[in-house]
């Protein structure tokens, strides 16, 4: 279902202190955009309505986060979710940057100087048709780009409801010299402790769909 255009979304975002309207300007220098420049930087690709980032950011003030999505109409909901979480926990909102970006062009805003230590990919489009598979966020074409700015030993945390995407992604990671250090095909019964349930995850779980999850380490 396509989200209706919200003409008020961009003005609200531009009035937000942690929104970055032109992320290309910070390529290679992201650490200096945060208050604590010594914190490691984690990246969420496709933050959606911000449920995941709101919890992670407010629970981990010692980590800096970059959260991206493509639509203002989605980003403005993420902004509100993040603000609410920090307000409820009485935390200073100084470790999150929210921005619009096409993930296929992620290499236009990040490079090896940015030293990203972890990437989160949650419930991305599975692109099931063969002619579209190169658009997958876990495809080798994308993983090659991530390797440029992900530190050696850095991790990609990947969650999906889609069986085919998950199994084929295992091959993508192998091809791009990542080691799978954790894997489960039933996350909610796995005993994995620090799982933040996203809006999509909750929906799929209620339908009885098992959630697949892995951690891949850059070698």
UniProtKB/Swiss-Prot annotation:
Catalyzes the formation of N(7)-methylguanine at position 46 (m7G46) in tRNA. This is tRNA (guanine-N(7)-)-methyltransferase. One of its GO terms (cellular component) is tRNA methyltransferase complex. NCBIfam families: PRK00121.2-2, tRNA (guanosine(46)-N7)-methyltransferase TrmB. It catalyses: guanosine(46) in tRNA + S-adenosyl-L-methionine = N(7)-methylguanosine(46) in tRNA + S-adenosyl-L-homocysteine. It holds the Pfam family Methyltransf_4. PROSITE patterns: SAM_MT_TRMB (PS51625). It comes from Clostridium perfringens (strain 13 / Type A). Keywords: Methyltransferase, S-adenosyl-L-methionine, Transferase, tRNA processing. It comes from the Bacteria.
């Amino acid at each position: 279902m396509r989200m209706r255009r919200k003409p008020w979304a961009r003005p609200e975002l531009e009035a937000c202190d942690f929104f970055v309207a032109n992320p290309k300007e910070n390529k290679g220098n992201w650490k200096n955009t945060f208050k604590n420049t010594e914190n490691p930087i984690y990246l969420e690709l496709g933050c959606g309505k911000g449920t995941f980032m709101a919890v992670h950011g407010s629970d981990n003030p010692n980590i800096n986060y970059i959260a991206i999505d493509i639509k203002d109409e989605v980003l403005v909901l993420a902004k509100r979710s993040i603000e609410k979480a920090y307000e409820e926990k009485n935390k200073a909102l100084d470790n999150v940057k929210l921005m619009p970006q096409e993930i296929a062009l992620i290499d236009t805003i990040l490079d090896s100087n940015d030293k990203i230590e972890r990437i989160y990919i949650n419930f991305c489009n599975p692109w099931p048709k063969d002619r579209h598979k190169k658009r997958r966020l876990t495809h080798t074409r994308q993983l090659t780009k991530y390797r440029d700015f992900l530190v050696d030993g850095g991790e990609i945390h990947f969650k999906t409801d889609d069986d085919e995407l998950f199994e084929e992604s295992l091959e993508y990671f192998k091809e791009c010299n990542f080691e799978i250090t954790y894997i489960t095909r039933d996350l909610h019964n796995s005993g994995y402790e620090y799982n933040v349930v996203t809006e999509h995850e909750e929906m799929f779980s209620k339908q009885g769909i098992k959630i697949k999850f892995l951690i891949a380490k850059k070698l």
